[in-house]
C-alpha cells in the first residue's frame, strides 16, 4: 500500500508495439487514461505538458476516467490543452460521469453487492466532450468514426462507452472498414 501512494505520483510513458496481420502505415498513438484529476493533481498536468512537448505521436486516444471529482474540470481542460491541435479520439469512463465514491479495499477480497448504482451524472462530462469534439476529435462512445491523420491516412475506428456502468453498446463497423472474405 505504501508503494501505491508513491507510484501514483510518478507517471510514466510506456511504449508497446502492436503487431498487425497486414501491412499498414506505421502510426503512433498516445493513450491518455485514468487521470482522475482533482485539485492537488497539478503534477499530472505538468507531466502531460512535457509529454506533448517531447514525445513523438501521430494521434491521441483518451480512454476515460479523467475526473477525480466535480472540482477537477479546470485541470482536465489544462491537461488536454496541449493535445487538442493534434488528431484525436475519445471514449468515456465511469469517472467522466460520476465522481468517485470511497470504497473499502477489503471489498475486493469478498463477495459484495457494492454501492447502489447512480443514474444521474454529477461531473461536467458534456463540457469535456464538447471541448474535444470542437477540436475535431472523434467521439467513439458506442460509435464508429473515421479520423484523418496527417502522414498516416484515414483511421477507421470503433468504440464503446464504459462497460463497468453498463453504458456500452457494441455497434457494427462503419462501411469504411475493409471486410475480408
Q: What is each stretch, according to the model?
A:
Residues 12-15, 42, 137-140, 166-169:
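Short gly/ser/thr-rich secondary-structure transition/capping motifs
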Residues 150-181:
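Catalytic-adjacent loop/helix segments of enzymes that bind and process anionic phosphate/sulfate esters
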Residues 8, 35-40, 65-69, 116-118, ...:
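Short, flexible loop segments at the rims of nucleotide/cofactor-binding pockets, characterized by
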Residues 29-31, 61-63, 89, 157-159:
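Structural motif
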Residues 20, 43-148:
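Core catalytic region of metal-dependent phosphoesterases/phosphodiesterases
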Residues 22-49:
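Short extracytoplasmic
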